[in-house]
Amino acid sequence: MGCCQSSFLKPSSLHDKKITSDDLSGRRGKGAKRGNRHRHANINEGRGWHFSDVPDFSEFSASVLRDATNNFNKNAVVSVCSDQEPNLVYQGCIRSDKDKRLIAVKKFSKTTWPDPKQFATEARAIGSLRHVRLVNLIGYCCEGDERLLVSEYMPNESLTKHLFHWEKQTMEWAMRLRVALYVAEALEYCRQSGLKLYHDLNTCRVLFDENGSPRLSCFGWMKNSKDGKNFSTNLAYTPPEYLRSGTLIPESVVFSFGTFLLDLLSGKHIPPSHAVGTIQKQNLNVLMDSHLEGNYPEEDAAMVFDLASKCLHNNPNERPEIGDIISVITTLQQKLDVPSYTMLGISKLEKLEMEHPKSLIYDACHQMDLAALHQILEAMEYKEDEVTCELSFQQWAQQIKDVCNTRQQGDSAFRNKHFESAIDKYTQFIEIGIMISPTVYARRSMCYLFCDQPDAALRDAMQAQCVYSDWPTAFYLQAVALSKLNMVEDSATMLKEALILEDKRGS
């Protein structure tokens, strides 16, 4: 995917209606049909199944959002990017008779926004925006002391995770260029729509949708400010003119974009003070991310470096306009037909997966977080064995006692993360054959994953399924093992089946 030219959407006036618990029983969000097109892009890539189904901007009641986030449960927190104000973002799910929609809810403090009318006015202005490059704002709440914003939910984490804290693979050069282009397009669209000041542009503000396409968070426009005097800007990302006068101007956004480009080049966050010094020394080789060595055109990197240096010019009048930045970055785009999720090394999420609220075990498997998966399996104990445990030869009490002791020894090793020892004890338990336990197979599968034996892990997960045919955990473990075996499509299919089974159990 990619685009050579951009045609930006003009903002539409959206109706503002308060959503209460009663409304959800019969209300389904109506899609806003808008003519956003990129002439040289695959229109499905980056847009997602839900772009045409973005609901109209609405005012939500506090009770609806509390229900959606399980009373703002700490386990629902999906973002804790630091700021000078509370900056917690929660994942939530709004349910009606016919619909389920995942949302993100940002919680502000009343002290930051003492005037609810000003909060509502700012939120409505941002809520009028609709664009494929944005994480669109779909509602707000300023009931009582609450100051809440509601946006689309992006399931594939932030640029901070993919650029700075990656596990499997570094972000390739072509994807970094795509991120730069899409963010610039989002900024230009909003500039043309009258919102010219984006605050604290950084990698935390860029999120990836179900297609793996980068989008700019709408929360960056929501600041308690007047005439450019912003009261809560993070000084780590601010331009020199703000430090001098306390005022932001449209050119300040270009400066922030320059620091953003340096992050993409280097693979690490460079504070603006260091960034300017690096630019002045013209030391591109030192700046470049060493993980990209030999995997990028040096001339293209030099052009991005030069563009960043112009964005970081001390004189705001000497900085390029966002439209000019787009023109330069567009010429550098590569792999136009390769989907973003492929370049990120993740699986594409389908509509089914986006509609269903995710469990902790789903998130752990989707993110290949073995440590979290281990904690979940340990917490499950043997609750699922009640319907499948076969106590053959119950008269052999001593044998039963012995086999239970063996299992307990395996459990102790599993709990203490002595996975090879746990494998030995669980194997003894299975070979005795007096008790049949899907949980033991699941735990041994988990141990094999930690010991880098995905084939054995897959066999045990399949055996757990044979014992307990509709147990979601068995499917989740198969998904992880298949991913470890680089069977990406099979893993995605298995993850989807696990999600369906889990949803059936919860309904």
From Swiss-Prot:
It is found in: Cell membrane. Residues 75-332 form the Protein kinase domain. One of its GO terms (cellular component) is plasma membrane. Residues 16-44 are annotated as: Disordered. This is Serine/threonine-protein kinase BSK11. Belongs to the protein kinase superfamily. Ser/Thr protein kinase family. It comes from the Eukaryota. Its EC number is 2.7.11.1. Interacts with BRI1, ASK7/BIN2, BSK1, BSK6 and BSK8. The active site is at residue 200. One of its GO terms (molecular function) is protein serine kinase activity. Phosphorylated by BRI1, ASK7/BIN2 and ASK9/BIL2. Keywords: ATP-binding, Cell membrane, Kinase, Lipoprotein, Membrane, Myristate, Nucleotide-binding, Serine/threonine-protein kinase, Transferase. One of its GO terms (biological process) is brassinosteroid mediated signaling pathway. Residues 16-26 have a biased composition (Basic and acidic residues).
